[in-house]
Swiss-Prot record:
It is a multi-pass membrane protein. Belongs to the cation transport ATPase (P-type) (TC 3.A.3) family. Type IIB subfamily. This is Calcium-transporting ATPase 5, plasma membrane-type. GO terms for cellular component: intracellular membrane-bounded organelle; plasma membrane. It is an enzyme of class 7 (translocase).
Length: 1088
């Protein structure tokens, strides 16, 4: 279910790290447990292994919403073929061009083109140009400017972008969409539901029963038994298919959201944000590091632009793009630098569009919890099958020895006196009972419950500003023990403004008071701001305020530049950019070399970045009058004092410096791409302090995490003083005087040995001046210590840490596409409070699954014991096939819907994280389950054996008395499940009604179940072998079921040991003990 772009890299990104899901059945299992798979990047062999681990009765039903391994292989084959085809075409053109390298080329006229709805070039010609990387054709069209003219595009201002222009371009060159394979139809889900082996057997039994019933009793009375079983099976099939189909539609919608990338385009001279689907041929698109190339196109201009084309070519090679290699392919990622491109082909006309149209997106996904529950289902299924076979043997033995009786008390089988039809009908009845026991005993609804709760949670999380890219992240988030959060934009508002400035050797007050500076230093500052930026300024012709675009830091600096009197476009035209060193989060600075317009030889190299890092490279500084002075130790101390003062006020400190250079020393244009900009002997211009306010509510969110047993750690590129001030403001630090290792600098952490790093990682609350690699080292150290780590990130260099973490959380607003594709969840509003809401939902997923397990196993145990004991002792079962199918429907589908959609509560954030290797069935669940199951078994078996006298039916004839008694047992059993559903909502809370009015679906399902039960008992007796009950018996039935509530209340007062029950069994059994030890060792040495 990952986004289109990430799906191509799935196979390459597989890895076998990350802790798995833990034991399948309590503590059952070993280090080689096939049902224990990693949460991220599980090897294909592991995924194949668990499917073959044990007897699986209903594979088609069991493996719903798990990874379709065969389809994954087919998808890879399709991708490989399309890549190979593209390779051949491009190789042919390159070979042709290589032969022309030493041939003197004459001026070639542009080939004849036919106008396309008023444009100077046709769709197929434009598509072929970029698809084939045909540089010769580009030159014949007049280069990039010629193609732009044909597309009626201004390379500076873009297209006009009005509705008529966009419509004309879509009509001429297509839209940036591609035909998607339709999702599976409802009929396909119906067919899958029909493949359930036990249901097939029941349908066969229904057909045989129908035929024999009509033969022996006539059509008027003989069709009831067979038809009622068939109808019950059909109902199960329809409800199952409907539920699956609904979940499928939800996942499709979420998949659409994941692919709907927002990007900037230049239209009418201004940068605006549009959906990737709204892109048209002729659009001018700015590109920066981490962006996905949104369509095929040609590079207009770029600086140090490198592109990762591995998603299209399959080769992990970074390709440099310039005027000699200008073709950009849709779907590729910008690895470095920035530039602008002209869109030439969109949608299905691109290689990416063809690729996406050829593969299916909805490939399913494995989640550890799904696999663990499949392990539980397999174990219980084997027990159920064994019991059903035992019941079958016992009933057949009793039948053929004359120990089974008809409702009127007569013997069912008398040797030599029974016809073949009657004998077969009796055997079919017995066989149906045994198969139905399997239906009830095998909890196929467990994996479905995971899908239901995940789909529900994902839909609700969208409203809470979180887009889930990987299903298993939902459940893993519930186990998170630590969150490593960025500062900027996550803990802060990302609304930056320059509030302090130190230029010319003194503080400017206010910070835009340019009058204190000479014209020479002012022009240098403005030149450095305008040229050394990836942002832009649009100046409206009507005199309105300029529109500033770019990253928050760039916008703050550009806005400050405007206050200094900077005219952005004029300043940029006064000098030309020779080379750019894009801002790098490792080096924490960016630079640009510009050739001054009025001089043939003078070059300025401007640097901007972290204040103390720029300061270390400066040998001199400029005074307010423009005079140059050496950087003395006293002056360095003065600068450092100003930096510390700003940092103590939680300001981000950015320094500006420059140096002069000679044009003769600048490398020639063909070698300039490898030029390393000089960063020594710099001249300090000054420092600005940028304020980024702390987000409202962050302190409360951090406090909530602490109460939930989750430690929040701040990892930032800012210096330690700024980091300390923000951490105190956000509540991450409580003591301003803490020292290492609680607050540590990235380089200090980096210098530690592996063992020291692990020990320090436990204590770290704040890491300042950290690089993306430091964040990665912190994540690895924490995971080695057994933590389940969630990490936030927005930059391209954050991708390794996001991928390494148990849960990678990227930012939806400031995050790059590379970061988003390496993440598991996208935080759409970049807000830390949304991260905490994701934790709540993660815990809710796990809690809801446990509620459903408790509820379902109670039904399993009670139904099995009642029918087995009754069958063995009397030869008859109180709950027949149709009744058990109805119970199965309540339990598997309606129960899953009711309990899997419980919204998260504050109670979830008042307990520690759930360990992923903790048993799925806790001691609290065992206690509740045993109490409820015992209560139901005792009550219903008492009714089975003493019901006639207890219900005062002795005066009735035997057949009617038995029918009333069995109906009463069936009715009480179903009502017990209804009342127990309320108990299951709050397994460890006394108030089971808390928040119940907020869950409308739960209330609706309970109401529907009760109404249908009343209809079945009162009006559908012919089909279900029941009879109408008096209102007195209804009251008694409700009273017995109601007793579940006070019993559960008292039961919850019984304390349970903290140690899992499985450990007690392991202590008693040497083999189990070894297995448990092995599992413990595995946990210690895994990446959990």
């Amino acid at each position: 279910m990952e986004s289109a772009s990430s799906s191509l890299a799935t196979s390459g990104r597989r890895r076998s790290s990350s802790g798995g899901g833990g034991g399948s059945w309590g503590s059952i299992g070993s280090a080689a447990d096939p049902f224990d798979i990693p949460a991220k990047g599980a090897p294909v062999e592991s995924l194949k292994k668990w499917r073959q681990a044990a007897l699986v009765l209903n594979a088609s039903r069991r493996f719903r919403y798990t990874l379709d391994l065969k389809r994954e292989e087919q998808r890879e084959e399709v991708i490989s073929k399309i890549r190979a085809q593209a390779h051949v075409v491009r190789a042919a053109f390159r070979f042709k061009e290589a032969g022309q390298v030493h041939v003197q080329q004459k001026e070639v006229a542009a080939p004849p083109v036919d106008g396309a709805l008023g444009f100077g070039i046709k769709e197929d010609q434009l598509t072929a140009l970029t698809r084939d990387h045909n540089y010769s054709a580009l030159q014949q069209y007049g280069g990039i400017s010629g193609v732009a003219r044909m597309l009626k595009t201004d390379t500076e201002k873009g297209i006009s972008g009005d509705d008529s222009d966009l419509t004309a371009r879509r009509n001429a060159f297509g839209s940036n969409t591609y035909p998607r394979k339709k999702g599976r139809s409802f009929l396909a889900f119906l067919w899958d539901a029909c493949k359930d082996l036990t249901l097939i057997i029941l349908m066969v039994a229904a057909a045989v029963s129908l035929a024999l019933g009509i033969t022996t009793e006539g059509i008027k009375e003989g069709w009831y038994d067979g038809a009622s079983i068939a109808f019950a099976v059909l109902l199960v099939v329809v409800v199952t298919a409907t539920s699956d189909y609904k979940q499928s539609l939800q996942f499709q919608n979420l998949n659409e959201e994941k692919q709907n990338i927002k990007l900037e385009v230049v239209r009418g001279g201004r940068r605006i944000s549009v959906s990737i689907y709204d892109l048209v041929a002729g659009d001018v698109v700015p590109l920066k590091i981490g962006d996905q190339v949104p369509a095929d196109g040609i590079l207009i201009s770029g600086h140090s632009l490198s592109v990762d084309e591995s998603s299209m070519t399959g080769e992990s090679k970074i390709v440099h793009k310039d005027q000699k290699s200008p073709f950009l392919m849709s779907g590729c990622k910008v690895a470095d630098g920035y530039g602008t491109m002209l869109v030439t082909a969109v949608g299905i006309n691109t290689e990416w569009g063809l690729l996406m149209a050829s593969i299916s997106e909805d490939s399913g996904e494995e989640t550890p919890l799904q696999v663990r529950l499949n392990g539980v289902a397999t174990f219980i299924g084997m027990v159920g099958l064994s019991v059903a076979l035992a019941v079958l043997v016992v009933l057949l033995a009793r039948y053929f020895t004359g120990h089974t009786y008809n409702p009127d008390g007569s013997v069912q089988y008398v040797k030599g006196k029974m016809g073949v039809g009657q004998t077969i009908r009796g055997i079919v009845g017995i066989f149906t009972v045994a198969v139905t026991i399997v239906v009830v005993a095998v909890p196929e609804g467990l994996p479905l419950a995971v899908t239901l709760t995940l789909a529900f949670s994902m839909r609700k999380m969208m409203r809470d500003k979180a887009l889930v890219r990987r299903l298993s992240a939902c459940e893993t988030m519930g186990s998170a023990t630590t969150i490593c959060s960025d500062k900027t934009g996550t803990l802060t508002l990302n609304q930056m403004t320059v509030v302090e400035a130190y230029f010319g050797g003194k503080k400017m007050d206010p910070p835009d008071n340019v009058q204190v500076l000479s014209a020479s230093i002012s022009s240098l500052i403005v030149e450095g701001i305008a040229q050394n930026t990836s942002g832009s300024i649009f100046e409206p012709e009507n005199g309105q305020d300029p529109e500033v675009t770019g990253s928050p830091t760039e916008k703050a600096i550009l806005s400050w530049g405007l206050k200094l009197g900077m005219r952005f476009n004029d300043t940029r035209t006064k000098s030309s950019i020779l080379h750019v060193f894009p801002f790098n989060s490792e080096k924490k600075r960016g630079g640009v070399a510009v050739h001054l317009g009025g001089s043939e030889s003078e070059v300025h190299i401007h640097w901007k970045g972290a204040a103390e890092i720029i300061l270390d490279s400066c040998k001199s500084w400029l005074a307010a009058d423009g005079s140059k002075h050496s950087m003395t130790p006293e002056k360095i101390s003065e600068f450092k004092k100003f930096i510390e003062d700003m940092a103590a006020s939680s300001l981000r400190c950015v320094a500006f410096a420059y140096r002069t250079y000679e044009m003769v020393d600048v490398p020639s244009e063909d070698r300039r791409a490898d030029w390393i900009l000089p960063e020594d002997d710099l001249i300090m211009l000054g420092i600005v302090g940028i304020k980024d306010p702390c987000r409202p509510g962050v302190k409360d969110s951090v406090r909530l995490c602490a109460a939930a047993g989750i430690k929040v750690r701040m990892v930032t590129g800012d210096n330690l003083q700024t980091a300390r001030a923000i951490a105190l403001e956000c509540g991450i630090l409580s003591d301003p005087n803490v020292s290492e290792p609680v607050i540590i600098e990235g380089k200090a952490f980096r210098a530690l040995s592996d063992l020291e790093r692990e020990e320090a990682a436990e204590k770290i609350s704040v890491m300042g001046r950290s690089s993306p690699n430091d964040k990665l080292l912190l994540v690895k150290a924490l995971r080695k210590r057994g933590h389940v780590v969630a990490v936030t990130g927005d930059g391209t260099n954050d991708a390794p840490a996001l991928h390494e973490a148990d849960i990678g959380l990227s930012m939806g607003i400031q995050g790059t596409e590379v970061a988003k594709e390496s993440s598991d969840i996208i935080i759409l509003d970049d807000n830390f409070a949304s991260v905490v809401r994701v934790v709540r939902w993660g815990r809710s997923v796990y809690a809801n699954i446990q509620k459903f397990i408790q509820f379902q196993l109670t039904v399993n145990v009670a139904a099995l014991i009642i029918n087995v004991v009754a069958a063995v002792s009397s030869g008859n079962v109180p709950l027949n096939a149709v009744q058990l199918l109805w119970v199965n429907l309540i339990m598997d589908t309606l129960g899953a819907l009711a309990l899997a959609t419980e919204p998260p509560t504050d109670h979830l954030m008042q307990r520690p994280p759930v360990g992923r290797r903790e048993p799925l069935i806790t001691n609290v669940m065992w206690r509740n389950l045993i109490i409820m199951a015992l209560f139901q078994v005792i009550v219903l078996l008492t009714l089975n054996f003493r019901g006639t006298s207890l219900l005062q039916l002795k005066n009735d004839n035997q057949a009617h008395a038995d029918k009333v008694k069995n109906t009463f047992i069936f009715n009480t059993f179903v009502l017990c499940q209804v009342f127990n559903e309320f108990n299951a909502r709050k397994p460890d809370e006394l108030n089971i009604f808390k928040g119940i009015t907020g869950n409308h679906l739960f209330m609706a399902i309970v109401a529907i179940t009760v109404v249908l039960q009343a209809l079945i008992v009162e009006f559908l007796g012919k089909f279900t072998s029941t009879t109408r009950l008096t209102w007195q018996l209804w009251l008694v039935s409700i009273g017995l079921a109601f007793f579940s509530w006070p019993l559960a209340f008292v039961g919850k007062l019984i304390p349970v040991p903290e140690r899992p029950l499985g450990d007690f069994f392991a202590c008693c059994c040497p083999g189990s003990k070894q297995a448990a030890d092995a599992k413990g060792d595995d946990a210690d040495h895994s990446d959990v």
